Swiss-Prot record:
Signal peptide: none annotated. InterPro entries: NA-bd_OB-fold, Ribosomal_uS17, Ribosomal_uS17_bact/chlr. One of its GO terms (cellular component) is cytosolic small ribosomal subunit. GO terms for molecular function: rRNA binding; structural constituent of ribosome. The gene is rpsQ. CDD domains: Ribosomal_uS17. One of the primary rRNA binding proteins, it binds specifically to the 5'-end of 16S ribosomal RNA. Gene3D superfamilies: Nucleic acid-binding proteins. It comes from Deinococcus radiodurans (strain ATCC 13939 / DSM 20539 / JCM 16871 / CCUG 27074 / LMG 4051 / NBRC 15346 / NCIMB 9279 / VKM B-1422 / R1). This is Small ribosomal subunit protein uS17. It comes from the Bacteria. Disulfide bonds: none annotated. The keyword Endoplasmic reticulum does not apply. The keyword Ribonucleoprotein applies.
């Protein structure tokens, strides 16, 4: 069984690649405080379909490049309230 994580896309600038931030929470072994740790994974996005803010699931795959060993398997949720992206605003004439 391959390892899977759920995270949020934090960058989609590269071609066929997205950066996915995965957060994990755990209780500190000595003090008991809940600690949050995060890690960014470079994940393969074949069709450039995932955008910043999307919650996605990634799965471990064979190495695709030097830093890419993860692939986006599915979209879990898109952020609400963001109707236009920066690129759409620039095409429309820069009026926001």
């Amino acid at each position: 069984m391959k390892k899977t994580f759920t995270g949020v896309v934090v960058s989609d600038k590269a071609d066929k690649t997205v950066s996915v931030k995965v957060e994990r929470r755990f209780a500190h072994p000595l003090y008991g405080k809940v600690v949050t740790r995060s890690h960014k994974y470079a994940a393969h996005d074949e069709n450039n379909e995932y955008k910043i803010g999307d919650r996605v699931e990634i799965i471990a795959v064979r190495p695709i490049s030097k830093t890419k060993t993860w692939k986006v398997t599915k979209l879990i949720e898109r952020p609400r309230g963001i109707e236009t992206t920066l690129a759409e605003t620039e095409v429309a004439g820069g009026e926001a």
